[in-house]
Amino acid sequence: MPRFESKGLCDQLRRAVVSIPSNIAEGAGRSSTLEFSHFLDIAKGSCNEIDTQILIAKNIGYIDEGYYNTLLHKIQHVSSQLYKLIKTVRTE
């Protein structure tokens, strides 16, 4: 991405990426499954945010279709794993 985006889209993307494991860790340290589930939902929301941000990056020409598809596949995999974890935690 262009250097001038280091404070824009890149920064937003970086925060969303860091948010996923951070929220999982914070939720795991909470005292109830309800709280854990809440933080997993936040992490899942960050996956959706990343999905949107990489689409924007592709649409404005910062990344090509191939790299977009690679990133999309990875974030969809993370999102799917989180969804399964959320279902498991909520049935406990």
Question: What positions do the PLM features span?
Answer:
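Amphipathic alpha-helical assembly/interaction segments
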Residues: 1-92
